[in-house]
């Protein structure tokens, strides 16, 4: 089998940030997949699964209701390795194009109060796997340490 593109990225050099993972053309439409790297691979503990699940619910709800990007959201969810999230947008974008959106998202998550959207047995297949407090902590950390002063090293994959 051929190695997939995401396995060709040197994860020993990968920093936390916002990266274009891939761009695909499906018919006449372009789809951009973003790698929202919240944890430094293999150097930092992965996201707790309950925190990641909570951020997925908050994030997907926020993004699909966003006034500018809501109709462009295809998918938002955690990576299997739990070091970040994938965001798929309809359109052709660069990392710098979505910095403000990702800042809004993680600020919203860090400040979130109330019931987690979709956190019921009717709405979710594993609704008890939630940790709002830890999700807020992780969102605040990513915002403060990465998004607030993001630079080119955090927007382009390492060579």
From Swiss-Prot:
Enzyme Commission identifier(s): 4.4.1.21
Cofactor(s) this protein cannot do without: Fe cation
Catalysed conversion reaction: S-(5-deoxy-D-ribos-5-yl)-L-homocysteine = (S)-4,5-dihydroxypentane-2,3-dione + L-homocysteine
Cofactor note: Binds 1 Fe cation per subunit.
Keywords: Autoinducer synthesis, Iron, Lyase, Metal-binding, Quorum sensing
The UniProt record lists the keyword Metal-binding: yes
GO biological process: quorum sensing
Gene3D superfamilies, sorted: S-ribosylhomocysteinase (LuxS)
Single GO MF descriptor: iron ion binding
Coiled coil: none
Pfam families referenced in this protein's UniProt entry, alphabetically: LuxS
Cross-referenced InterPro entries: LuxS_sf (IPR037005), Metalloenz_LuxS/M16 (IPR011249), S-ribosylhomocysteinase (IPR003815)
Residues annotated as binding Fe cation: 53, 57, 124
PANTHER family assigned: S-RIBOSYLHOMOCYSTEINE LYASE
Function: Involved in the synthesis of autoinducer 2 (AI-2) which is secreted by bacteria and is used to communicate both the cell density and the metabolic potential of the environment. The regulation of gene expression in response to changes in cell density is called quorum sensing. Catalyzes the transformation of S-ribosylhomocysteine (RHC) to homocysteine (HC) and 4,5-dihydroxy-2,3-pentadione (DPD).
Family under the similarity heading: Belongs to the LuxS family.
Assembly description: Homodimer.
NCBIfam families: PRK02260.1-4 (NF002604)
Protein name per its UniProtKB record: S-ribosylhomocysteine lyase
Organism: Maridesulfovibrio salexigens (strain ATCC 14822 / DSM 2638 / NCIMB 8403 / VKM B-1763) (Desulfovibrio salexigens)
Gene name tied to this protein: luxS
């Amino acid at each position: 089998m051929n190695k997939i593109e995401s396995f060709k990225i040197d994860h020993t050099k990968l920093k936390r940030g916002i990266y274009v993972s891939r761009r695909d053309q499906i018919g006449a439409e372009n789809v951009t997949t973003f790698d929202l790297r919240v944890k430094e691979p293999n150097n930092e503990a992965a996201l707790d699964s309950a925190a990641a699940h909570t951020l997925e619910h908050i994030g997907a709800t926020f993004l699909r209701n966003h006034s500018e990007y809501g109709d462009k959201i295809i998918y938002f969810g955690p990576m299997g390795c739990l070091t970040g999230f994938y965001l798929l947008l309809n359109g052709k974008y660069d990392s710098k194009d979505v910095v403000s959106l990702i800042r809004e998202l993680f600020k919203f998550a860090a400040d979130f109060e109330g019931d987690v959207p979709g956190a019921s047995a009717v709405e979710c297949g594993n609704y008890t796997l939630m940790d709002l407090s830890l999700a807020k902590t992780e969102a605040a950390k990513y915002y403060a340490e990465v998004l607030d002063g993001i630079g080119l090293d955090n927007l382009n994959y390492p060579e």
